[in-house]
Curated annotation (Swiss-Prot):
The CKS-17 immunosuppressive domain is present in many retroviral envelope proteins. As a synthetic peptide, it inhibits immune function in vitro and in vivo. The record marks R387, V388 as: Cleavage. Disulfide bonds: none annotated. It comes from Pan troglodytes. InterPro entries: TLV/ENV_coat_polyprotein. This is ERV-H1 provirus ancestral Env polyprotein. The surface (SU) and transmembrane (TM) proteins form a heterodimer. SU and TM are attached by noncovalent interactions or by a labile interchain disulfide bond. SUPFAM superfamilies: Virus ectodomain. Glycans are attached at N10, N47, N197, N222, N265, N283, N352, N370.
Length: 457
């Protein structure tokens, strides 16, 4: 279903078209449903699209129709820039579980550990609780208390060009998110989930911890690069009981910094730090530069570490290990970026996810047509249109195509067009966040009302 509005400079004229067509659509098709607040969201998106189109291609923006689909599944994905893969921060959302199936936020776990350190009659449990308490304090600067938004935001999303880099992880019992086809990925980085445990002796007992994930390096190139040397900070360790990869005791080596093959563009390259799950972006044109990291958590870090970190304690070498707790690590992208897995989009990766994903900008399906064309407005009763409406995808109007993106890193020449999609993606992400916060407030009010009702029974 298409919403159309002509894009003159007069905003009031646009609103008249909007009101008329939306009114006609809703009464002609009562089954039409959309999860977003249609009037304000679409009006803002249409205005933003027209202003961005006018800035990048004024000849097309002058006297044109802008059309946006009302379907909740009709969205277009554009691969994110290579720099976004190396510099975009992500947030950590941590939950914990004990022998019971309940999950606890980190602040409740810290309270539990404080009590265990002081009151537990078992000295080994006191030591384990003290270690975990230190661990959570170490992670607290990166933990986001805002509830993450899980589940697919959109389905049946199309990506008209191949992404320069995809990330794949296979878990037989994982949460399936979707799989991009090989034709949609120029290069795929494969992650291996841990299948073993690490044993660490702490005083008089042994601690068993879920091992770290790893990166399949078969198709990566060892170019003996020194770009990872001294450039891995900031860095965090999710295994504080082991030597930290961020400490001076474990200096990075050139062999851990591998090149992602990119035959289409030799002026830019992506280097993968396989020990710290970090990506470095290098512009190799003179003078050679490298973008600094804004956060120790990158999209690759999130994809690799999103999982469950289990901890068991063993009092003696011959006793059966007992489960202490499990940390569930979940990560969310910054506003404006999304994980595209198959045809579904996500803002957050759940623990133990499985699939093949890439980073994208996400926008509603927007098309435009020449202002001299007559676009039919749906009547109160559905009628079959006799003429095909000549609509052009916004992507091609901005000069983006498979040939210009070149299936690789070299999209600097069309950065203006990509920035247009970044702005639209930020707009969409902000709307999703606003809706989520509104629903959270409503849920809190419902919970409060339910508590009052129970007290008055």
């Amino acid at each position: 279903m298409i919403f159309a509005g002509k894009a003159p400079s007069n905003t009031s004229t646009l609103m008249k078209f909007y009101s008329l067509i939306l009114y006609s659509l809703l009464f002609s098709f009562p089954f039409l449903c959309h999860p977003l607040p249609l009037p304000s969201y679409l009006h803002h998106t249409i205005n933003l699209t027209h202003s961005l189109l006018a800035a990048s291609n004024p000849s097309l923006a002058n006297n044109c129709w802008l059309c946006i689909s009302l379907s909740s599944s009709a969205y277009t994905a554009v691969p994110a820039l290579q720099t976004d893969r190396a510099t975009s921060p992500v947030s950590l959302h941590l939950q914990t579980s004990f022998n019971s199936p309940h999950l606890y936020p980190p602040e409740e776990l810290i309270y539990f550990l404080d009590r265990s350190i002081k009151t537990s009659p078992d000295i080994s449990h006191q030591q384990a609780a003290a270690l975990l308490h230190t661990y959570l304090k170490h992670l607290s600067p990166y933990i986001n208390s805002t509830p993450p938004i899980f589940g697919p935001l959109t389905t049946q999303t199309t990506i008209p060009v191949a992404a320069p880099l995809c990330i794949s992880r296979r878990r037989p019992t994982g949460i399936p998110l979707g799989n991009l086809s090989p034709s949609r990925c120029s290069f795929t980085l494969h992650l291996r989930s841990p299948t073993t445990n690490i044993t660490e002796t702490i005083g008089a007992f042994q601690l068993h911890i879920t091992d770290k994930p790893s990166i399949n390096t078969d198709k990566l190139k060892n170019i003996s690069s020194h770009y990872c040397l001294g450039r891995h900070l900031p860095c965090i360790s999710l295994h504080p009981w082991l030597p930290s990869p961020c400490s001076s005791d474990c200096p990075p080596r050139p062999s851990s910094c591998l090149l992602i093959p990119s035959p289409e563009n030799n002026s830019e390259s992506l280097l993968v730090d396989t020990r710290r799950f970090l990506i470095h972006h290098e512009n190799r044109t003179s003078p050679s530069t490298q973008l600094p990291h804004q956060s120790p958590l990158q999209p690759l870090t999130a994809a690799a570490l999103a999982g469950s970190l289990g901890v068991w304690i063993q009092d003696t070498p011959f006793s059966t290990p007992s489960h202490l707790f499990t940390l569930h690590l979940q990560f969310c992208l910054a506003q404006g970026l999304f994980f595209l897995c198959g045809s579904s989009n996500y803002m957050c990766l759940p623990a133990n996810w499985t699939g093949t994903c890439t980073l994208v900008f996400l926008t509603p399906k927007i098309q435009f047509a020449n202002g001299t064309e007559e676009l039919p407005v749906p009547l109160m009763t559905p009628t079959r249109q006799k003429r095909v409406i000549p609509l052009i995808p916004l992507m091609f109007g901005l000069g983006l195509s498979a040939s210009t993106i070149a299936l690789s890193t070299g999209i600097a020449g069309i950065s203006t067009s990509v920035m247009t999609f970044r702005s639209l993606s930020n707009d969409f992400s902000a709307s999703i966040t606003d809706i989520s916060q509104t629903l959270s407030v409503l849920q809190a009010q419902v919970d409060s009302l339910a508590a009052v009702v129970l007290q008055n029974r």
